[in-house]
């Protein structure tokens, strides 16, 4: 990204969907308003009649929203799982596929066998699909390397992707994603490697800003998850968790006990878990793509989340095994159709609540004075259009840190 200019730039004659909950109108809509941007941040929002003199860009009545935030992705990986999906449709069990070398282990193998340049080339078109939908910030997880050099490689590629494409990155260490082949039968030993070697080394190298764990019967136990959280906490690193996707293990309560940023998936979330998340300020990250692709039937408890006023983020969970959808608009649509969110809730889920899921709620996810000038400009009349019709992105331009992309 180019360096933000200190000159005041006036983005005038826009229809602003601020997503600011303090504004009375749905979506925080402000008709005929202008954004005043300086040093990569929003200096002020003023009515069109009050625009000062200075360098201006005429939006010609276009819709402006906060830049979209995809707060949960596995964008960097090698290989493909398309044939495995076809096998599953033909009745072959995941256990059979895994025993023959498929499943997550096939992605681990392909990722380990790929160079940084190869992983970058594979991830680039995936990222471009998200950028075409107005994404200005995204999270990318490791988790297909499962050893020090390959986890490092994945995180380095994530950083290069962001640097080359005008997008802000939140990198997450997900080394506790699965037990690698060389540690089969010794998950505790692998967690020791994560806690004592991978996590502190890559943290010292500045390659990530949060730590995630897959806490499930087919992943890691709550006890193993807590070991990773303790190692992260000792270094002052925020945590989050893949929890309650396939069963109820108390993962949401565990994430909440460590004041985690988000609890993700949460189809089997209990009321006790929801209450714990409310108390800790943990965001509920809904991932409808995985729910759809796995043909699940148990839905996240959206009504309970509303009752307890737990913020709901929405993300793609883009990954090769369970959610091969690089479309945040589609995730928003699925969240409405499958989980019962309103379009306005879905928009909050990819803006201000997604920002909170990344610990950036004070600077991202709204059009508001003092916030980073990340926004999307649309040839659209209303924000609902992007939720209603996924696959047709009316994006005009993205603006990242005040710079037109």
UniProtKB/Swiss-Prot annotation:
Binding site for Zn(2+): 72, 74, 242, 317
Gene3D superfamilies: Metal-dependent hydrolases, Urease, subunit C, domain 1
Residues the record lists as binding 4-imidazolone-5-propanoate: 81, 144, 177, 245, 322
NCBIfam families found in the cross-reference section: hutI
GO molecular function: imidazolonepropionase activity; iron ion binding; zinc ion binding
SUPFAM superfamilies reported for this sequence: Composite domain of metallo-dependent hydrolases, Metallo-dependent hydrolases
Record flagged with keyword NAD: no
Protein role: Catalyzes the hydrolytic cleavage of the carbon-nitrogen bond in imidazolone-5-propanoate to yield N-formimidoyl-L-glutamate. It is the third step in the universal histidine degradation pathway.
Catalyzed reactions per annotation: 4-imidazolone-5-propanoate + H2O = N-formimidoyl-L-glutamate
Lineage, top ranks: Bacteria, Pseudomonadati, Pseudomonadota, Gammaproteobacteria, Enterobacterales
Protein name, entry field: Imidazolonepropionase
Record keywords, A-Z: Cytoplasm, Histidine metabolism, Hydrolase, Iron, Metal-binding, Zinc
Any one biological process term the GO annotation gives: L-histidine catabolic process to glutamate and formate
Cofactor, free-text remark: Binds 1 zinc or iron ion per subunit.
Cellular component GO terms held in the UniProt record: cytoplasm
InterPro entries from the UniProt entry: Amidohydro-rel (IPR006680), HutI (IPR005920), Metal-dep_hydrolase_composite (IPR011059), Metal_Hydrolase (IPR032466)
Main location: cytoplasm
Organism whose genome encodes this protein: Klebsiella pneumoniae subsp. pneumoniae (strain ATCC 700721 / MGH 78578)
Pfam families: Amidohydro_1
Cofactor(s) recorded in Swiss-Prot or TrEMBL: Zn(2+); Fe(3+)
Pathway membership: Amino-acid degradation; L-histidine degradation into L-glutamate; N-formimidoyl-L-glutamate from L-histidine: step 3/3
Residues annotated to bind Fe(3+): 72, 74, 242, 317
Residues that coordinate or bind N-formimidoyl-L-glutamate: 144, 319, 321
Family: Belongs to the metallo-dependent hydrolases superfamily. HutI family.
Cellular localization per UniProt: Cytoplasm
EC number from the UniProt entry: 3.5.2.7
């Amino acid at each position: 990204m180019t360096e933000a200019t200190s000159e005041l730039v006036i983005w005038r004659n826009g229809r602003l969907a601020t997503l600011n909950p303090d504004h009375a109108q749905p979506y925080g809509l402000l008709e005929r308003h202008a954004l005043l941007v300086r040093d990569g941040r929003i200096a002020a929002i003023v009515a069109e009649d009050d625009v000062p003199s200075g360098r201006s860009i005429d939006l010609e009545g276009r819709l402006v929203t906060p830049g979209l935030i995809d707060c949960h992705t596995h964008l960097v990986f090698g290989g493909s799982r398309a044939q495995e999906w076809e096998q599953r449709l033909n009745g072959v069990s995941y256990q059979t596929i895994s025993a023959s070398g498929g499943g997550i282990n096939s992605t681990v193998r392909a990722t380990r066998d790929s160079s940084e340049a190869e992983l970058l080339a594979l991830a680039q078109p995936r990222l471009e699909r998200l950028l075409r939908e107005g994404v200005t910030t995204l999270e990318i997880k490791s988790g297909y390397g499962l050893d020090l050099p390959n986890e490092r490689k994945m995180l380095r590629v994530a950083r290069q992707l962001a640097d080359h494409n005008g997008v802000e990155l939140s990198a997450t260490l997900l080394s506790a994603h699965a037990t690698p082949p060389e540690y089969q039968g010794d998950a505790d030993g692998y967690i020791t490697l994560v806690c004592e070697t991978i996590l502190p080394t890559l943290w010292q190298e500045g390659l990530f800003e949060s730590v995630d764990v897959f806490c499930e019967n087919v992943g890691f136990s709550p006890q193993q998850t807590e070991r990773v959280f303790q190692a992260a906490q000792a270094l002052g690193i925020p945590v989050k968790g893949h929890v309650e996707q396939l069963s109820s293990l108390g993962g949401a309560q565990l994430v909440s006990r460590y004041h985690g940023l988000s609890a993700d998936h949460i189809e089997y979330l209990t009321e006790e878990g929801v209450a714990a998340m409310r108390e800790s300020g943990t965001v509920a990250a809904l991932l409808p793509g995985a729910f759809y692709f796995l043909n699940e039937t148990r839905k996240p408890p959206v009504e309970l989340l509303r009752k307890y006023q737990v913020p709901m983020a929405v993300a793609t969970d883009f990954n090769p095994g369970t959610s091969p959808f690089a479309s945040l608009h589609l995730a928003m649509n699925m969240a409405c159709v499958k989980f019962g969110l309103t379009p306005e809730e879905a928009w909050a889920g990819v803006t201000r609540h997604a920002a909170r899921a990344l610990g950036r709620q004070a600077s991202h996810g709204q059009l508001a004075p003092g916030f980073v000038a990340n926004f999307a400009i649309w040839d659209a009349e209303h924000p609902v259009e992007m939720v209603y019709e996924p696959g047709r992105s009316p994006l005009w331009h993205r603006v990242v840190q005040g710079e037109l992309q």
